[in-house]
């Protein structure tokens, strides 16, 4: 079965580099190469200066994998494989699933978490949130069947900013253990948390069939490195991922691996400015939302860098987004890009430009009240 076009990425391709203002980006502002290298210690700087632009190890640079393990219980680099995040998501589904397997997946979600599963010919059930964007593990349990092979979760959650408690995450692990199925946990926004939230451990720390995906794109503000990694205690699974990777990227970029090592070893210099910026932008948007009738509901995110904002409009969210980018140059991602019913747009809080965008959006909404409401 062929995969459908990636709607969200195609929408970004259409507008991301032509729109004047981006209000829906899920990543944080990208740091410059000099910023990364300025944080390198002498050993790391020597690695950079001595870099060879040949092939790298297919599983990932051993020093990079060792740097990754500082954030996990496992200290065995054989339980870590490096690749681009999208590639690793794709490979995971391909090596784990067969036609007619059953999968339970969080929804709404980044399209690739569902589409690859569909393309294999699996049956998929969706674990959906309540109106306040909370996910109930008891509802998940009712979706699991005897032939369920995989549970797909994503917390911090894109696009809603929802999060779980440790008790809720442990419930999910218990459900998976009871049914002997894998858990694939998209943790790309790991560590981006509101002050009120307690950081969850990676799923690979809690369950031998737990597969954790993280990378430098979101939390670190280093999306251009295209560095991601899987961590799993199941060495056979890791081996199959590496073997499948031989048909795709084969290996990672040597410069990206060294820059990723530096970022991981100096994580607070990347993470803390992003957390501060996200929280400031959330507060600004909350004030803005209170003054706008077109915003029906704004639930501040508990985690991650995005929120799913409900609109009070007489058109679809896609029509709203198209009109907004055409008339005001502001790009937003509508609910249709997540196959989610209702009138919502994703708002991203990881960019310094948000305070400058809101006044422009305010003028647009005031000038188009009759059209929108």
Language model features with spans:
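PLP-dependent enzyme catalytic core of the Aspartate aminotransferase-like
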Residues: 74, 104, 314, 323-332, ...
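Helix C-cap/helix->beta junction micro-motif
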Residues: 120, 147, 178-179, 292, ...
């Amino acid at each position: 079965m062929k995969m459908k076009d990636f709607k969200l990425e195609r929408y970004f391709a259409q507008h991301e580099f032509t729109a004047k203002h981006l209000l829906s980006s899920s990543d944080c502002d990208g740091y410059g190469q000099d910023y990364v290298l300025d944080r390198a210690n002498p050993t790391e700087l020597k690695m950079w200066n001595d870099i060879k632009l040949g092939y790298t190890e297919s599983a990932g640079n051993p020093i990079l994998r060792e740097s990754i393990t500082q954030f996990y219980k496992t200290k065995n680099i054989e339980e870590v494989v490096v690749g681009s995040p999208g590639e690793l998501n794709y490979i995971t589904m391909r090596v784990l699933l067969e036609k007619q397997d059953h999968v339970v997946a969080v929804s709404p979600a980044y399209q690739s978490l569902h589409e690859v599963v569909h393309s294999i010919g699996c049956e998929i059930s969706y674990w959906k949130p309540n109106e306040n964007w909370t996910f109930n593990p008891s509802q998940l349990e009712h979706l699991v069947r005897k032939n369920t092979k995989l549970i797909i979760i994503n917390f911090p959650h894109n696009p809603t900013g929802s999060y779980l408690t440790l008790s809720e995450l442990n419930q999910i692990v218990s459900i998976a253990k009871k049914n002997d199925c894998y858990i694939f946990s998209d943790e790309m926004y790991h560590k981006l948390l509101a002050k009120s939230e307690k950081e969850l451990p990676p799923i690979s720390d809690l369950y031998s069939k737990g597969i954790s995906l993280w990378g430098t794109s979101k939390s670190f503000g280093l999306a251009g490195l295209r560095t991601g990694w899987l961590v799993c205690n199941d060495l056979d699974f890791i081996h199959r991922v590496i073997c499948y990777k031989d048909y795709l990227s084969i290996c990672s970029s040597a410069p990206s691996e060294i820059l990723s090592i530096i970022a991981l070893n100096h994580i607070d210099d990347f993470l803390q400015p992003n957390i501060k910026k996200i929280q400031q932008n959330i507060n600004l948007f909350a004030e803005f939302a209170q003054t706008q009738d077109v915003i029906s509901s704004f639930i501040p995110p508990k985690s991650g860098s995005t929120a799913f904002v409900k609109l009070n409009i007489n058109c679809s969210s896609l029509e709203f987004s198209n009109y907004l980018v055409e008339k005001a140059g502001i790009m937003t991602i509508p609910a249709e890009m997540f196959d989610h019913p209702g009138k919502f747009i994703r708002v991203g809080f990881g960019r310094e430009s948000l305070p400058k965008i809101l006044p422009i959006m305010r003028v647009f909404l005031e000038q188009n009240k009759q059209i929108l409401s």
